Amino acid sequence: SHKPIFQILVEKLGRLVTLAKEAGGPKAFLPFLVMTSPMTHKQTVDFFEKHSFFGMPKDDVWFFAQGVMPCLTPEGKIILESAGVMASNPDGNGGVYPALKKSGCLDRLRSLGVKSVHCFSVDNPLCRPADPRFVGYCLSKNADCGNKCVWKATPQEKVGVMARKGGKPSVVE
């Protein structure tokens, strides 16, 4: 497909809303929360606006910026972007939770009665946002969180794996 990844994901969410409506349940509310980096925030918002939010109601697409952290050398020294200005980079996927809180999105979700969220990386076009079977399974097990993953293709593949670290489930790189 030559569609932008955001369009693919919005279309998948739209199909879920349609399926819920056809099933006769309550009106489905599936906002699309898009975490950006401070460096890409404006371009991402502009991209959605340029494409009329890919047909999704504008009020159902929420943008929030992840945090940043200082750039360090391997020796732990701060890297400067320019004289007197510390270089920084986005704080990664783990930054989603503090960013949801800081942005006000978490409070907004709570005020709307949202009880569950599905976090996924935007660079995965195979992702099934709010996958009803997966979400339903997690809810049926009263799970605080769930994680879908696949086996590594080879032992040498450089991807994180699910493992216990310090007795807790973790993604180990």
Task: Outline where the language-model segments fall.
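Domain-scale recognition of functional cores that engage charged ligands
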Residues: 1-173
